[in-house]
Amino acid sequence: MATKVITGKVRASFVHIFEPQSVNGSEPKYSCSFIIPKSDTETIGKIKAAIEEAKQNGVSKWGGKTPANLKLPLRDGDIERPDDPAYADAFFVNANSREKPGVVDRRRIPITDPLMVYSGCYVRASVTFYPFNTNGNRGIACGLQNVQLWCDGEPLNGRVRAEDEFDALDDVDDEDFLD
């Protein structure tokens, strides 16, 4: 049993929502990291409640009790990524899925262009939290369901859009260009 949460405005990072990606030879999955400002207490509260519910649902998978070394999906960017300013004063969750997530714009029109949703843009996300017990690893996983583009943001890869980097040029006569 999974518990669903729809986030508020979060920042997308490591966006792989249009094509699945394999990590270290594992099964290819769709994935995205969602950076949640610590000031968004509503989204953080919903995620914490969903994790607690998933823990209760997982007791049967974990031999009747919650393990002490349980892996949890809500992580603190200040602790785990102290050198990355995008994660400062924020929590994050890494969500993934074997199935392609739905991706829509603000008006719920499907987005198929992978350049529209990128690491650094702002989105809302539909994610689920569920218990797992695989190969001795126990914890709560975060499943990727759907993504809604909220607005553009500064790309996290450091790349600048061409239209932001260059000034418009006047029309040039080809003969003048060669001089």
Across the structure, where does each feature detected by a protein language model lie?
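OB-fold ssDNA-binding interfaces and closely related basic DNA-contact patches used
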Residues: 1-92
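Acidic, gly/ser/pro-rich intrinsically disordered tails
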Residues: 1-4, 154-179
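Beta-strand elements of well-folded, non-transmembrane domains
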Residues: 36-38, 129-131, 151
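Extended Gly/Ser/Thr-rich low-complexity repeat segments
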Residues: 46-55, 102-110, 114-117
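Short, basic/aromatic beta-hairpin or loop at an interaction surface
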Residues: 92-106
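Exposed beta-sheet edge/beta-hairpin loop segments within beta-rich domains
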Residues: 107-123, 130-140
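OB-fold/S1-family single-stranded nucleic acid-binding modules
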Residues: 135-154
